[in-house]
């Protein structure tokens, strides 16, 4: 038996022992994870700096703080969520107990991603632990420093059998997917998401797939362009554009395209200076392969700003493209880099049509001072989530589930939705053995004639 199979077998045995069932045990494990973050914060920040060139402030406020907040929220709310939930009774069930009981699914596989390798690996794990599951954790091999660190420190704080960390690349992930799990959560590309779902189908394992897509950003003529462009520039170029819910491209009327370019440039210079390469706040591309892919998308385009790169350091300058042809390569795949195309449309209706002709994105953004424009855009399009007059922040809230639709994924998590995703809501009816006389009508033999209703 391979090491991977042995780890999954131990996780299954540990879950079957029943020790994750008591809420106190789950809370103890969440508190241990809390201590891990607090005591290993410098090591976590160092790994993020090595993998993605994140400085201490960005590492903490883009990744670490959200996990700490999620843990605190789970600990606070767990007794309420885990309690049996009474449901409405009928006249025939007045003497019965009717309720929904949340039970853990079993052994959950969480396959993390590299762009936010701490947050997007550990935050789903928090929900799975709170729901009482065993969790097999597979960090992304591309963020190798974080993957190595997690494999070292998690066993020092959490139950070693219940929460194993498996490192490796495609061969190890392929082997993992041959095992039987009770739920799989994967964050990454649509192509790999299809592979995950195919593997899960063998055992009818439910999946949560957090995928990507080209998240549109419509900028209406009727809005404060200074504010809009500052917020767009922040969300797009954070982490060097490597954010699954980053605005992928802008849709706007041609009459305001030049204004948008100038205001984006102004914000970028305020954020990162004249040379973003020297900025401690500006990230780097994760790998040489991704660097070449993103640089290739710029070729042949009309560059209004940036467009340069340094392969040795995997740096790509903040780049704005104008008058982009919707059929060009940069509009055919999720960019996942610091390149912002602008596509011109003549009306709100044309923007909606443009969005609806493409796969459903993970996020949809719009900037307008007109509530009717915002309501129309939301009503007539589909996406995993929406933010109006801002970007990205909707995924940071406990109260809003984070997930995709169609090609951008299925299922969701965050806050209470995480607990529900990793739980089976079991319908329960408990009936007394007395009063069987009242049930005689259901027993054979049935009457020869139907009575009048």
From Swiss-Prot:
PROSITE patterns: ALDEHYDE_DEHYDR_CYS (PS00070), ALDEHYDE_DEHYDR_GLU (PS00687). One of its GO terms (cellular component) is cytoplasm. It catalyses: an aldehyde + NAD(+) + H2O = a carboxylate + NADH + 2 H(+); octanal + NAD(+) + H2O = octanoate + NADH + 2 H(+). GO terms for biological process: aldehyde metabolic process; lipid metabolic process; xenobiotic metabolic process. Gene3D superfamilies: Aldehyde Dehydrogenase, Chain A, domain 1, Aldehyde Dehydrogenase, Chain A, domain 2. GO terms for molecular function: 3-chloroallyl aldehyde dehydrogenase activity; alcohol dehydrogenase (NADP+) activity; aldehyde dehydrogenase (NAD+) activity; aldehyde dehydrogenase [NAD(P)+] activity; benzaldehyde dehydrogenase (NAD+) activity. ALDHs play a major role in the detoxification of alcohol-derived acetaldehyde. They are involved in the metabolism of corticosteroids, biogenic amines, neurotransmitters, and lipid peroxidation. Oxidizes medium and long chain aldehydes into non-toxic fatty acids. Preferentially oxidizes aromatic aldehyde substrates. Comprises about 50 percent of corneal epithelial soluble proteins. May play a role in preventing corneal damage caused by ultraviolet light. This is Aldehyde dehydrogenase, dimeric NADP-preferring.
